[in-house]
Structure formats: structure tokens, C-alpha cells
């Protein structure tokens, strides 16, 4: 375990459990603490360009349901709540550490909702596996740079339906208010969870990193 921890401290391109380098090419995104991939890379992922290096992939669309239903990346799953992200951690998929099961998160621009839920997943994963650090159910997670908007502009043929509904679309103002109210309660719960997480990290002799 010390070897993996040492590697993670010295090599910045390793996945979350320190076992391998990232299988997808990354780009310098807005969020420096997260590994970002371009729309082109995700397009290649959809067409099987990385089938020889990964076991499976899941695209996690963190937008609100009306945005997702208005148009999303082929095969993407609409997981926009904390409860749904928690289910990812407790699900069976991703538990076999010998397989490379990757996740790609995004929202409209990948500026707020996507990054927040990606970080939530990693924090929950670390907490769930705090007794066997640095093991993770999902050690390899990415953020789609530019979000759905950027992907749609470049690869519209890989969207279903071939459409893009902005979060602030005037026809969905009522739905937006509904989900924003809910998200405030989720954020309050996340802050409490993060405080508990910091206590676990601070009390660990290894001074665990969430990433």
C-alpha cells in the first residue's frame, strides 16, 4: 500500500488508486483538480476507439431532466442528484479492480454541476473504502471539457435527440426553479458530509488524499 501511496504523491498522471496511468488523453480544463477530456476523445470513446484499453465506460449527465430529455450524448445516464451518485458507489459495477471501468461526468458547460457531482462521487468512494486506501470502486473518472454544449456543437450526430436545451431556456423556468430548490438541500447535506470526510482524512496516519 505504501508503494501505491508514494507513487500517487510523486506521479501526477496516475488514476485514483495509483495503479495505472490514465487510459484516455487528458486536456488542461478549467478545474485543475480534475482530469478533463475533450469532446473529440468522448466521440472516439463512443465509436470504440478505446475498447482495447478499457473494460467499460459510463457517461454521467448531471444536467436537469428537462435538459437531458431535450438532447444528450448517446448512451449517457441522467444522474443529477446526490442520491443517484451515491447509488453509483454502492452498485456492483466498478468493484473489480482488475478491470478498467471509467466514468465521464458532464453538465451543460462542465463548470458547476458536473464537477460538483464528480467530486462528490470521489469523496463517497474514498469514505466507503477508507479502510483500504487507496483502493477505489471508480479510480478512473473524467470531466468532459466544455460540457454538453461543446460536445453538441462538434458531434451533433452522436446526440439523441439531436438537440440542445439550455438550462435557462424560457420554456422550462418552472422546472428550473423546482430543481434549484432541491439542489440547495443537496448542497447543505454535502457540506456536512465534507466536514465528516475531513475528520477522517486528518485522523489518518497516511494523510489520505481524496484524489
Model-derived segments and their meaning:
Residues 8, 29, 42, 49, ...:
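Conserved beta-strand elements of beta-rich interaction domains across eukaryotes
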Residues 40-54, 74-104:
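Helix-loop module immediately N-terminal to the HCX5R catalytic loop
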Residues 59-63, 76:
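Short hydrophobic beta-strand that contains or immediately precedes a catalytic carboxylate
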Residues 90-145:
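Catalytic cysteine-centered active loop of the rhodanese-like fold, especially the PTP/DSP P-loop
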Amino acid at each position: 500500500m505504501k508503494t501505491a501511496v508514494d507513487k500517487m504523491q510523486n506521479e501526477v498522471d496516475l488514476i485514483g488508486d495509483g495503479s495505472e496511468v490514465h487510459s484516455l488523453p487528458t486536456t488542461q480544463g478549467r478545474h485543475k483538480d480534475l482530469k478533463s477530456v475533450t469532446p473529440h476523445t468522448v466521440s472516439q470513446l463512443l465509436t470504440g476507439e478505446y475498447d482495447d484499453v478499457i473494460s467499460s465506460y459510463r457517461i454521467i449527465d448531471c444536467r436537469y431532466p428537462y435538459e437531458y430529455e431535450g438532447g444528450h450524448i448517446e448512451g449517457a445516464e441522467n444522474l443529477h442528484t446526490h442520491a443517484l451518485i451515491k447509488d453509483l458507489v454502492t452498485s456492483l459495477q466498478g468493484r473489480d479492480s482488475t478491470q478498467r471501468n471509467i466514468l465521464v461526468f458532464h453538465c451543460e458547460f462542465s463548470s458547476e454541476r458536473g464537477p460538483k457531482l464528480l467530486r462528490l462521487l470521489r469523496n463517497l468512494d474514498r469514505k466507503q473504502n477508507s479502510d483500504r486506501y487507496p483502493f477505489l470502486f471508480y479510480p478512473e473518472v473524467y470531466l468532459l471539457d466544455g460540457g454538453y454544449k461543446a460536445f453538441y456543437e462538434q458531434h451533433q450526430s452522436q446526440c439523441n435527440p439531436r438537440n440542445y436545451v439550455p438550462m435557462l431556456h424560457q420554456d422550462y423556468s418552472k422546472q428550473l426553479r423546482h430543481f434549484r430548490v432541491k439542489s440547495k438541500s443537496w448542497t447543505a447535506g454535502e457540506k456536512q458530509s465534507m466536514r465528516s470526510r475531513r475528520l477522517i482524512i486528518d485522523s489518518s496516519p497516511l494523510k489520505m488524499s481524496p484524489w
